[in-house]
C-alpha cells in the first residue's frame, strides 16, 4: 500500500537555447570588413552604405569604417562610413557645417 498518492506529471520543463540576436557593433564603433553589425530575424534594420545582408538577415560590414545608424522614411538603416565621411556627418550633427 502506497504511503503517498503519486504526483501528476508536469507539462513544463522545456526551454529553448537563446539565439544571441541583436546589435553587435554600435553607432560610432570602428569595424573591419566582414565584422557582424546586427543579428536579426527579418529586416528590423536595413543595410545602408557599405553594409551587406546575409541569407539569415545578418548585417555585416563590407569595408573598414565607422558604424552609423540612421532613420530614413520611418525605416532604420545601418551604414559603414569612411573616417572622412564620419567626420563630415558628425560635424553636421553638431551644427558645425563648413
Swiss-Prot record:
Region feature Disordered, mapped onto this chain: 1-20
UniProt GO BP: assembly of large subunit precursor of preribosome; ribosomal large subunit assembly; translation
InterPro entries xrefs: Ribosomal_bL27 (IPR001684), Ribosomal_bL27_CS (IPR018261)
Keywords: Ribonucleoprotein, Ribosomal protein
PANTHER family named among the record's database cross-references: LARGE RIBOSOMAL SUBUNIT PROTEIN BL27M, RIBOSOMAL PROTEIN L27
GO molecular function: ribosome binding; structural constituent of ribosome
Taxonomic path: Bacteria, Pseudomonadati, Aquificota, Aquificia, Aquificales
Record's compositionally biased regions (Polar residues): 1-11
Record protein name field: Large ribosomal subunit protein bL27
Amino acid at each position: 500500500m502506497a504511503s503517498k498518492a503519486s504526483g501528476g506529471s508536469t507539462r513544463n520543463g522545456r526551454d529553448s537555447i537563446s539565439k544571441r540576436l541583436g546589435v553587435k557593433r554600435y553607432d560610432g564603433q570602428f569595424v573591419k570588413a566582414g565584422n557582424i553589425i546586427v543579428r536579426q530575424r527579418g529586416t528590423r534594420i536595413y543595410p545602408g552604405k557599405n553594409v551587406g545582408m546575409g541569407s539569415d538577415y545578418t548585417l555585416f560590414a563590407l569595408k573598414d569604417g565607422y558604424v552609423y545608424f540612421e532613420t530614413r522614411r520611418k525605416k532604420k538603416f545601418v551604414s559603414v562610413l569612411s573616417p572622412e565621411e564620419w567626420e563630415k556627418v558628425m560635424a553636421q550633427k553638431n551644427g558645425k557645417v563648413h
